[in-house]
Amino acid sequence: MSYRSPSCASSDCYHSSDEGSTDGAAAAPSQPDRTISFTFLGTGGSSALPLISCVTEPDKACPSCFDTLWDPASKNIRGNTGGVIRVPQADGTEATILLDCGKTFRDAALNWFPKKGFRRIDACILTHLHADAIDGLDDLRAWTYKSAIENTIPIYCTRVTYDAIAAGFPYMISKAAASGGGALPSFDWHIMPEDQDWIICGLTITPFPFHHGKYFRPVRPLICAAFLIDSSVLYVSDVSYIPEEQWARLAEYCALPSQNGLFPSAPRGSSTQRRLPRLQAVVIDVGGGLTQNPSSHIGLPHAIAISRRLGALRTYLTDFSHGTKHQTWLDWCVRFGRGETSDRGKRAIHHKAVPAWRTWLEGEKPPPPSSAHYPDNPSPEHTTGLNDDPEIFIRRAFETVEEWAGGVLPGRWVRPAFDGLTIEWQRWGDGPNGVDWGSQRIKDDHYR
């Protein structure tokens, strides 16, 4: 099922074909460009990077924050997680969809919009109600006040997120609640379902309600929407657990591997029935660092385990905390991709068959680590991964991934995202009858 907004800021922002028809495929030749792109405006957690506490006391600053003091182009400068999706339209233009609008949005827009050629915002989609996803909405007045760039911006979110914004920022919902000089943003609100497709600017964006910690009384999960974009890229910015029913929904949109690593065969009985596409990339939260016991953010062990279950061709890590430099994350990713393991992993790989992925329960505790994994009298920094020594971090990263995933498998393509990185892919279905279901259609402007 899908949900189409009743209105849009521009007439070319929506396809007119009904969901389930073949009009979209037939119209493809009229589109000069079928390339969709996503630019990271932010890849840091809610505190962003660097931290004030680090840069104001350089002698005690962590490696990632210290690096930003001397390099204004440092990849360790990270805003709140979010980005911009660019979608080609039938008339040759591109629509711009803003994904989240957090506390650091204004600085990110000032930096990246001119460099990337962005200006108009055709729509904004929100993942959840936290400040790092919504507290930059007021800054969108620069686009709409006195119609500086556009008259209004359509905002798409779930009921829970809308209600939180209405309670905290009532003037964004109704100008009757405003005070002051009257410089207000102008929004067209769309309250969206969390279990149906959203069709925005001709692009299918499928929300998945994932857990982002458990709070409240009685205890219940805070929901953060993950977005499957074009059945090609899954954006998971804030997650602590993916319920099994959501894995079942994902399997309706993408070809997921079995536990032996094999993908589903083509459907029988029809030579024209299209296979589900293989996921091109997952953008995934590692805000928990190397933790195996996440509260509100998973860490690297869970992120790799989720990527394995998704069978994603590429994995981009995001939502970084301070403590470990971008280069150290990159060094681990490259070595992991080459199939390197810890010393324990080298021994384990010869003793048992390892499934491609495993399931786990929410709140499941990690296995007790071997004492051989730690130095004598380990420091708190070592157990969390915040350590000045890159080799200690890399070793511990291998160990935690191996412990949580239940064993060692050959490496995957994994890279740390950074602010300003752009990934792009050919729209799903360009091949005849979808025969490109498993081919790689994605690349970025920095990594190979």
Predicted features along the sequence, with ranges:
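Active-site flanking residues adjacent to catalytic metal/cofactor-binding acidic residues
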Residues: 99, 127, 236-237, 284, ...
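Core dinuclear metal-dependent hydrolase active-site scaffold
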Residues: 2-112, 182-268, 417-448
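Short, glycine/acidic-enriched loop or turn micro-motifs at the edges of active sites
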Residues: 103, 131, 240-241, 288, ...
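A short helix-to-beta-strand connector/capping loop
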Residues: 34, 151-152, 178-188, 201-203, ...
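Active-site neighborhood of divalent metal-dependent phosphoester bond hydrolases
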Residues: 146-189, 383-393
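Binuclear metal-ion centers of metallo-dependent hydrolases, dominated by the metallo-beta-lactamase
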Residues: 244-448
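Residue-level signal for inorganic ion chemistry
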Residues: 38, 165, 315
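Active-site metal-binding motif and surrounding structural segment of the metallo-beta-lactamase
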Residues: 88-98, 102-157, 276-280
